[in-house]
């Protein structure tokens, strides 16, 4: 199989939406029957995003094989059926780490290690490895053309055209075409200068994606084509839209997929975008709306909860309901009380780390339990629900997690020190373990209890869900919690770790140790989120009576 490569770069400014554009194009190509995958190359020095602040970087997206990756991989999985893996995302830090390890081992036989060829060769090797067994691989280069950090990646993809053949490589460049209100026209000069910067590196773009708040007029597209040495049909206008799921149809309407298939000599049928048309129809035709409060500590940057927010929207599609998400700082709950939680149809507490804001989350879980408000807890959201239950129902007033109070009287949540991974290998951790790459990560088997709400939502006895955490329910105290009314609705594959808890006396109270948001998609949704939104609609109807 010959793999074709589409390299996606961005210019003028950051945050143009390279990831969304790449994912949308991949969705069209997949709809034409092609085997497609997407890679993200990040120029920062961190080995991976696992220890980066969510406020700076946004969420860490966890793949099936346990890689902690850029949030763009979440977009990729939401747009195409191909599952991402650790091969789909790597950083400058990872490349340098690998090269230096080989140098220390003596693999380079005493050679002087340089950016060219050693770093660029390592980048190319990873790109080729990630694209194996695929018809098309889209490779998104993080950052903006002109950044010093991106230069090794740009040099590597320039060399790729020489090594795999220009007929199997295509350079797609996203650029800003701003609208000037004073003159009433769009300006193409920033695009011209961005392309000039790429040309100075040795890369001639084949496709230009022109980002603007409005459609770029045909005469301006012709001007861009002339000055940037790109066919006019390869200058694509990508205006702002109210839903990212409209972008595949927008790109297809301008013939981008046809142009690329002809460029690569691929003979494939027309794209069937009927599934995306259904998604857009569901978005545009809700029969009602609900308000769900998401209580967290990173709400200053909503991208810190990107997959959770998208999963709630997907659940809205499945229930034909518009989901209004109210972001609530858990510290505000501590200082202002549960009054700020009123008028919510459901409550969700997502994952997180550290003690800041935890007591506000515990108050939130208590409020949801006592007021019979639908509740979904994820990771830390399950742990705070457990702590709240232990304190106020099971009579364990000093209950806590050893993450927050190491010597607490009732450590209902404690550090996992030993477990088996998905391959059966024993993993061990301690309080002294490094933070990076030392959590229980990736897709894990979960057995659902026969009489549980979770079993009825999933419709099957065993499921696979993704994890990212160090702390677990302390089984030593579990019997006391169960005798007080707690139900364990899901166990790990070896039946040793609690994965889901429920409160049978509550209309809808589910909390999971895993992260269900990572497997939700606009076309399929996710059972837990769909169940939460449905329960929110039912709660709203009861409250209005």
From Swiss-Prot:
Regulation: Allosterically activated by GTP, when glutamine is the substrate; GTP has no effect on the reaction when ammonia is the substrate. The allosteric effector GTP functions by stabilizing the protein conformation that binds the tetrahedral intermediate(s) formed during glutamine hydrolysis. Inhibited by the product CTP, via allosteric rather than competitive inhibition.
Residues binding ATP: 15-20, 72, 239-241
List of residues binding L-glutamine: 352, 380-383, 403, 470
Catalytic activity field: UTP + L-glutamine + ATP + H2O = CTP + L-glutamate + ADP + phosphate + 2 H(+); L-glutamine + H2O = L-glutamate + NH4(+); UTP + NH4(+) + ATP = CTP + ADP + phosphate + 2 H(+)
GO molecular function list: ATP binding; CTP synthase activity; glutaminase activity; identical protein binding; metal ion binding
Keyword Signal on entry: no
Role of this protein: Catalyzes the ATP-dependent amination of UTP to CTP with either L-glutamine or ammonia as the source of nitrogen. Regulates intracellular CTP levels through interactions with the four ribonucleotide triphosphates.
Protein name: CTP synthase
Organism in which the protein naturally occurs: Sodalis glossinidius (strain morsitans)
């Amino acid at each position: 199989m010959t793999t074709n490569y589409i390299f996606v770069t961005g210019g003028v400014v950051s945050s143009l939406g390279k990831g969304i554009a790449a994912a949308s194009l991949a969705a069209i190509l997949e709809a034409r029957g092609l085997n497609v995958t997407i890679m993200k190359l990040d120029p920062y020095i961190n080995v991976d995003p696992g220890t980066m602040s969510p406020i700076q970087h946004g969420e860490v997206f966890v793949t099936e094989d346990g890689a902690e990756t850029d949030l763009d991989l979440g977009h990729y999985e939401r747009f195409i059926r191909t599952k991402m893996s650790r091969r789909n995302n790597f950083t400058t830090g990872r490349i340098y780490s690998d090269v230096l390890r080989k140098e220390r081992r003596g693999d380079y036989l005493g050679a002087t290690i340089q950016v060219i060829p050693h770093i660029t060769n390592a980048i190319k090797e990873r790109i080729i490895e990630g694209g194996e067994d695929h018809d098309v691989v889209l490779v998104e280069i993080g950052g903006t053309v002109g950044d010093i950090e991106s230069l090794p990646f740009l040099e590597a993809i320039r060399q790729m055209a020489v090594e795999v053949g220009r007929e199997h490589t295509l350079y797609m460049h996203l650029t800003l075409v701003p609208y000037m209100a004073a003159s009433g026209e769009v300006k193409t000069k920033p695009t011209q200068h961005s392309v000039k910067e790429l040309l100075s590196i040795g890369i001639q773009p084949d496709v230009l994606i022109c980002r603007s708040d409005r459609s770029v007029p045909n005469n301006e597209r012709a001007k861009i084509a002339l000055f940037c040495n790109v066919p006019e049909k390869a200058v694509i206008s990508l205006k702002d839209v109210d839903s990212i799921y409209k972008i595949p149809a927008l790109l297809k309407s301008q013939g981008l997929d046809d142009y690329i298939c002809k460029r690569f000599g691929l003979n494939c049928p027309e794209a069937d975008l009927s599934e995306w048309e259904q998604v857009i129809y569901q978005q545009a035709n809700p029969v009602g709306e609900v308000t769900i409060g998401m209580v967290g500590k990173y709400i200053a940057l909503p991208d810190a909860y990107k997959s959770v927010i998208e999963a709630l929207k997907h659940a809205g599609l499945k229930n034909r309901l518009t989901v209004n998400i109210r972001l609530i700082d858990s510290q505000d709950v501590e200082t202002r009380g549960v009054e700020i939680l009123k008028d919510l149809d459901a409550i969700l507490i997502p994952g997180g780390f550290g003690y800041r804001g935890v007591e506000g989350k515990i108050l939130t879980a208590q409020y949801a339990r006592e007021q019979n408000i639908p509740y979904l807890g994820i990771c830390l959201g399950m742990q705070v629900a457990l702590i709240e239950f232990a304190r106020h129902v099971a009579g364990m007033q000093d209950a806590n997690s050893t993450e927050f109070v190491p010597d607490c009287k009732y450590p209902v949540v404690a550090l996992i020190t030993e477990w088996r991974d998905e391959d059966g290998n024993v993993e061990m951790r301690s309080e002294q373990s490094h933070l990076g790459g030392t959590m229980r990560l990736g897709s894990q088997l979960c057995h659902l209890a026969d009489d549980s709400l979770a079993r009825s939502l999933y419709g099957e006895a065993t499921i696979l869900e993704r994890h990212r955490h160090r702390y677990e329910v302390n089984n030593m105290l579990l019997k006391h919690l169960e005798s007080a009314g707690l139900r364990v609705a899901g166990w790990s594959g070896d039946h040793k770790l609690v994965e889901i808890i429920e409160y049978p006396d509550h209309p809808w109270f589910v909390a999971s140790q895993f992260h269900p948001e990572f497997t939700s998609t606009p076309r399929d949704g996710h059972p837990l989120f769909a169940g939460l939104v449905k329960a929110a609609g039912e709660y709203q109807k009861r409250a209005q009576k």
